[in-house]
A protein has these predicted regions:
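A general secondary-structure junction signal
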Residues: 49-51, 112, 184
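A glycine-rich helix N-cap at a beta->alpha junction
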Residues: 68-79, 168-192
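N-terminal amphipathic, basic helical "cap/leader" segment at the start of enzyme domains
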Residues: 1-103, 207-208
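Arginine/glycine-rich "motif VI" loop of SF2 helicases in the C-terminal RecA-like domain
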Residues: 39, 145-146, 172-173
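Small-aliphatic-rich amphipathic alpha-helix that forms the alpha element of a beta-alpha
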Residues: 28-29, 33, 106-166
Length: 208
């Protein structure tokens, strides 16, 4: 698959088939993540790839398994989500946070070595490592798409990252930015409508 085709086809998917991913494909996808630009040229990234369902069950035990309609509406108000398309996307995504990762063929936990306090940076340069790992994550999304798979993602809420550390045993100086689920999309998987944006409306030549 050509690069621009993979970029165009990449979508966050939350409905997966029950289908294993060959280990060599997983390694290609993770290797694509390792090719991302890195702030200090050290690529101090590691990836925990979880295929064992018992481990996945334990890892995800802290994540809510659903949300009531009343709580969903309150969340939209609390987060000031007033756009109709945005509300529709959240109504689809929030109830699936547990199931989407449980049903994925693998769950990947990307980790970066913390050399600064990412959650309490002194300046924007202290976020360089955090920015780099997200470049790696995007490569994983695009490589998964190119291989015929799709990804879903959850950023840890509350103590989910600390809980994950207890389950998976990664070192204290490594930071977990997200959970990634990778799998084969179901034929009827929900595709969230994206905002239609004309690139010409977002480019400012030479100055704003």
């Amino acid at each position: 698959m050509e690069l621009y085709e993979a970029i165009e086809k990449r979508r966050t998917i939350r409905d997966f088939e029950n289908e294993a991913i060959p280990s060599e494909i997983i390694e290609r996808i993770i290797n694509a993540g390792l090719q991302a630009p890195t702030n200090d040229h050290m690529r101090d990234w590691h990836y925990i790839v979880i295929q064992d369902k018992n481990t996945v069950i334990k890892l995800l035990d802290i994540i809510p398994k659903g949300i009531s309609d009343e709580d969903m509406e309150q969340l939209l108000k609390d987060w000031n989500l007033s756009d109709c398309e945005q509300q529709s996307a959240y109504r689809n995504a929030v109830p699936k946070q547990h199931k989407m990762l449980m049903d994925a063929s693998v769950v990947v936990i990307p980790l970066l070595k913390q050399k600064t306090d990412i959650l309490h940076p002194d300046n924007i340069s202290h976020l360089n490592g955090f920015a780099s790992i997200w470049c790696s994550i995007e490569n994983i999304f695009l490589a998964s798409t190119a291989e015929g798979y799709a990804c879903t993602l959850r950023v840890p809420l509350g103590d989910e990252d600390k809980y994950a550390k207890g389950v998976l045993g990664f070192p204290n100086d490594y930071f977990m930015p997200c959970f990634i689920g990778i799998g084969k999309p179901k034929k009827d998987a929900s595709i969230i409508k994206q905002k239609d944006i004309n690139v010409k409306d977002r480019i400012h030549w030479d100055r704003w």
